[in-house]
Design a protein with these regions (language model features):
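Conserved P-loop NTP-binding catalytic core
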Residues: 37-44, 48-50, 54, 63-122
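Electropositive, glycine-dotted interaction segments
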Residues: 112-185
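Short acidic, glycine-rich loop/turn motifs
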Residues: 10, 104-106, 129
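Glycine-centered tight beta-turn/hairpin loop motif at sheet-sheet or coil-to-beta transitions
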Residues: 15, 106-110, 132
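Residues in well-ordered beta-strands of folded domains
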Residues: 9, 23-25, 103, 116, ...
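Pre-Walker A-like glycine/lysine-rich segment at the N-terminus of P-loop NTPase domains
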Residues: 4-68
Length: 185
């Protein structure tokens, strides 16, 4: 499997106030084992997922949140200039940041990428991977303070060029940073 979504989490977006999680992790039930996907030894994943619920329960807003995250990473919203507003649509007019997180597997390596933001800035952003089955930080950012494990000097220079309203993952891709290349794809 080249790329596979394991889990998506959204908080404070449109009608979604508290954290909502969409997970492809299979239960321990062995009834349909032959249909499950096994990208690694640890977890079996569902090949499809259904979202169902009452009218106006937020199903479409979960999908909208996924599309907003995608738009901020690879779409037009990724090309923000300094001071430009971000596509922030919080629950009920609250002033709290919106948070998105995605756990996925790319070329056999598990990644966790997430960020929180409002209309003006990115408050928190992080990227972890599990290259040898152990969690390793690629980068994190909280209120403008960055942390890196590799290529520190190059990444510090790049982080200084990243405006408050732009995702560091997008900036690192713009500058062809090898540490974030696979996660960005």
């Amino acid at each position: 499997y080249s790329i596979m979504l394991i889990q998506f989490t959204v908080e404070n977006h449109r009608s979604i106030k508290n954290s909502a999680v969409i997970s492809f992790a299979a239960s321990k039930d062995k009834s349909f084992e032959e249909y499950l996907l096994h990208p690694d030894e640890k977890k079996a994943l569902l090949p499809v997922l259904a979202i169902y619920g009452a009218n106006a329960a937020g199903k479409s807003n979960v999908l909208h949140a996924m599309m907003t995250m995608k738009e901020m990473v690879v779409g037009n919203a990724a090309k923000v200039s300094k001071g430009q507003k971000l596509p922030w649509e919080p629950f009920g007019g609250t002033k709290e940041p919106t948070s998105f997180e995605m756990v996925f597997i790319f070329q056999g390596v598990r990644y966790t990428y997430g960020f929180s933001f409002d209309a003006k800035k990115i408050y928190k952003e992080y990227l972890y991977h599990w290259p040898n089955g152990r969690e390793a930080l690629i980068f994190s950012r909280e209120n403008g303070v960055y942390e890196f494990r590799e290529n520190v000097n190059e990444q510090v220079t790049l982080s200084n060029r990243t405006p408050d309203n732009k995702l560091y993952l997008v900036s690192s891709n713009d500058w062809n940073l090898p540490q974030t290349e696979n996660a960005y794809r």
